[in-house]
Structures are given as structure tokens and as C-alpha cells.
């Protein structure tokens, strides 16, 4: 008897998930393998991917359009949380995993599967994200992980697939592993495993090289309501279209490339190349608007919790109780984050040149001005400073004799 009878496999069309299909059937005795491929705005035609799964031996091959929930339920909360893992990576890939896991569980319930499966290897973050998300949503459902257990190198995996007539998409000329969705692209493997090797221009697709960007700067305005971006240059856009527009604007000016050494969940460091033009642009603008509309103590506390929020998402704990509790805090802070931020895009940089909030700005010109309109009570400062510095004064009197 096999490890499971009917399995729903998260399918991307790549080497590992394609090889999983015959492997589950031939090696583990699975009778039916149903694949599910998610459309996350990656731009691929899903029909060839669907057919590829059937050619590899899938009993049924399903595809699903998840672009709208991906942006509204996952990307926008990340923008509100200014989510940057280790201060840099805006979680473009990590945000997709809990959504895919959620839909995987739903499909498994719909078709009566007794297990789900994925093609993640034992060294990556995605295995953690899928396993933990599925356990959070359906603790009774078995999770099969052939790529983690088969012990094959990438070359051996490709060779196994060739036994079943699968052509290899990886060549000596293009040895990279690429994951993409509407929010961005992650590129790794091949020569990039040497952290001293500069990424070649061929690995980028969403952003221009700085020397190929316009010589003239472009100023844009991004409008936010309740912490969510709603308009660019005065034109209101639904969420998916807004992300596409932000990608185009930022990418045209070479904004959004990251080359970083990253600490993976499993304890190793990895070299990652990311392209996330629109997401980074929107987070930068959102942070600037918060500096105008949030009280100082709220802003400081939020900046601390943003790091934890990003860590939780990166570590696969999207559906965990702490992440959900932090969501409540983040959402409450965004009520008054309404306004417009102006940025200048030029040669790989986005520079804030203005910010305004008609109803929620905490910047009061009359209090900040040094001119004749100054309404700040300077005389109050003396008493404030005395009380503020009293603990230090008392300590000094005791210890600096």
C-alpha cells in the first residue's frame, strides 16, 4: 500500500514539481496525483503548465487565478506593515506561500484527497512555509515531501525526469533557479552561489540596468487610504492594476534590485537576488506617510513590531496566533494613514520630495516654524527640561562627586 491514495500536488511546472509526479506514483505507490498550479501574476501561460503536468502523469491538472487575493490579502497587509525581512527583502516570494497552501488544502477537501504534496527541497525556506501553513489549516492532512526525501542532486533529479520524457529547462547557459509572481522575482543557484560573482544582466526582467534608464527624472504621486495604496498620479486603480503600474514605473528607472546574503529559516546563509520594484516603492512611500500621520510612540513601537511581523511571515507563520495578533495592531495604526507622497524616480533611486495629509497630518506648521508665526511656547521648555533631566541630575549628584 502506498503512502497515500489521492494526493494534491502544488505544481509550478519546474523540474522538482514535475519529477514529483512520476516519483509519487512509481516510488511511493500513490494512485492519483492531482496537480494545482497557481496564477500569481507571474505572466506565464498556465495552459502549457497544465498540459505539462498531464504529460508527466498527473491524473488531473488544475489551475487557479489567485492574483486578486494575493495582492489584497497578502501584499497589501505587507505594505501596511512595511515588511522588510532583515531590513531589506519585502517578502515577495514568502507572501505567496500561505496563499498557495490555503488553496491546496481547499482543493484537497474538494476532491477528497488524503494528502497534499509539494516539491520543496530540504534546504529551502518554502518547505517550512508550506508544511507549517498546511498544519495550521488542516492538521489532519498528510503532507508528502518527495524532494526532501529522495536524496537526489539537481542533476540526478533532471536525469530522473528524463527517464519519463521530461525535457530539462535548465542549460549550462542558464543555470539559474527563478521564482516569480506579480510582486517580484527571486533568482538563485548556478554562478550566483559565489557571493563575489556579480549577477549578470540576463537574470533581470522587471527592472532596467541603471545605464539603460531615462536620463530625466520622473516625479510621481502615490495616494494612500487606510494605509493601502489606492491611486498613482491621481488615477485610482484597483489593487492588481496598481501593483502593475508601480512595477512599471519603478522598473523603468532601475529601482527594486536587491543582492543580499540572507539568513534562511533552516539556519544557513544564502545569496539571493531579488527584483521587487513596485513593492519596494510602495513601502517606501507608505513609511514616509506614516512619519507624517502617526504619533511618535506609535511609530516607534510599530517599527519594532514590523521586524517581528516580517520575521514571522518569512518563517512560515502567517497563520500563527502571534502574526494574527500583530495584524490587529497593524490594522489599528492604519486608520489615519491617509494622504499623498511624492517621489522622484531617477537612476535606481526613489527620493521622497513631498508628503501631505489633509485630515491626518500631525505636522503643525505653526508649532514647527521658527518664523513670526511660531506658536510654540518657548517658556515651557525650561520646566520641561528640568523635569526630564531630573533622574540624570540626581544620578550625577550621587556618582560624579
From Swiss-Prot:
Entries under InterPro entries matching the protein:
Arginosuc_syn_C, Arginosuc_syn_N, Arginosuc_synth, Arginosuc_synth_CS, Arginosuc_synth_type_1_subfam, AS_cat/multimer_dom_body, Rossmann-like_a/b/a_fold
Q: Which GO terms describe its biological process?
A: argininosuccinate metabolic process; L-arginine biosynthetic process; urea cycle
Q: What is its EC number?
A: 6.3.4.5
Q: Which domain of life is it from?
A: Bacteria
Q: Does the keyword Nucleotide-binding apply?
A: yes
Binding residues for ATP: 10-18, 38, 119
What are the recorded GO MF terms, alphabetically?
Answer: argininosuccinate synthase activity; ATP binding
- Per UniProt, the enzyme's principal EC class comes to ligase
Coiled-coil residue windows:
none
Q: Predominant location of this chain?
A: cytoplasm
Which residues does the record give as L-aspartate binding sites?
121, 125-126
Provide the protein's localization. Answer: Cytoplasm
Q: Which UniProt keywords apply?
A: Amino-acid biosynthesis, Arginine biosynthesis, ATP-binding, Cytoplasm, Ligase, Nucleotide-binding
Q: Name one GO cellular component term.
A: cytoplasm
Pathway(s) annotated for this protein in UniProt: Amino-acid biosynthesis; L-arginine biosynthesis; L-arginine from L-ornithine and carbamoyl phosphate: step 2/3
Q: Which residues bind L-citrulline?
A: 89, 125, 129, 177, 186, 262, 274
Reaction(s) catalysed (UniProt annotation)? L-citrulline + L-aspartate + ATP = 2-(N(omega)-L-arginino)succinate + AMP + diphosphate + H(+)
Self-association and partners: Homotetramer.
Family to which this protein belongs: Belongs to the argininosuccinate synthase family. Type 1 subfamily.
Name this protein carries in UniProt: Argininosuccinate synthase
Report the source organism.
Answer: Synechococcus sp. (strain CC9311)
